[in-house]
From Swiss-Prot:
Region (Required for interaction with GDI1): 165-185
Keywords for the protein's UniProt record, in alphabetical order: Cell membrane, Cytoplasm, Cytoplasmic vesicle, Golgi apparatus, Membrane, Synapse, Transmembrane, Transmembrane helix
Record-given protein name: Prenylated Rab acceptor protein 1
Protein encoded by which gene: Rabac1
GO molecular function, one term: protein-macromolecule adaptor activity
Annotated InterPro entries: Prenylated_rab_accept_PRA1
Subunit structure, as described in the record: Homodimers. Interacts specifically with both prenylated Rab proteins (including RAB3A and RAB1), and VAMP2 (synaptobrevin-2), in an exclusive way. Interacts with NDRG1. Interacts with free GDI1 in the absence of Rab proteins. Also interacts with PCLO.
One biological process term in Gene Ontology: vesicle-mediated transport
Pfam families to which the protein is assigned, alphabetical: PRA1
């Protein structure tokens, strides 16, 4: 607990507090904890995009080694690149924004309705899971018209290209033990 507060104080000194940067709408729970861990383990963006550290790998072995080590090292940065691409895709597609508004509006109405009373159809109580499935079914035509399927594949493709090319061409720093290893002759 004390170590966590020390890390938070260090981040606040730098002007970045993970708790203030996270939206207040995300409830405390597993999702918020995961996002806080990602935010805490993010690598400096300066080293992430340093142009002097990009070069072509010499062979396939080095390429594979770079891919594995960079994905492991910059995992949190890659998550935020992915989230940024999702945000870009949603903001630049007005129909997708409308479809998301319809879906989240229906979910919010159902949430308010369940606070007041249970929903009963044909003499049977409808569970919240079924209600949200109904909201998804109602908003499905909007997602289909907005081209949500192509947006999903665009985001996945753009993420793979960006992360794959960064991981392949970004030089890895040698680990502490690798610098001093000598091979027998």
């Amino acid at each position: 607990m004390a170590a966590q507060k020390d890390q938070q104080k260090d981040a606040e000194v730098e002007g970045l507090s993970a708790t203030t940067l996270l939206p207040k709408l995300i409830p405390s729970g597993a999702g918020r904890e995961w996002l806080e861990r990602r935010r805490a383990t993010i690598r400096p963006w300066g080293t992430f995009v340093d142009q002097q550290r990009f070069s072509r790998p010499r062979n396939v072995g080095e390429l594979c080694q770079r891919l594995v080590r960079n994905v492991e090292y910059y995992q949190s940065n890659y998550v935020f690149v992915f989230l940024g691409l999702i945000l870009y895709c949603v903001v630049t597609s007005p129909m997708l924004l409308v479809a998301l508004a319809v879906f989240f509006g229906a979910c919010y109405i159902l949430y308010l309705r369940t606070l007041q009373s249970k929903l009963v159809l044909f003499g049977r109580e409808v569970s919240p899971a079924h209600q949200y499935a109904l909201a998804g079914g109602v908003s499905f035509p909007f997602f289909w018209l907005a081209g949500a399927g192509s947006a999903v594949f665009w985001v996945l493709g753009a993420t793979l290209v960006l992360i794959g090319s960064h991981a392949a061409f970004h030089q890895i720093e040698p680990a502490d033990g690798e610098e001093l290893q000598m091979e027998p002759v």
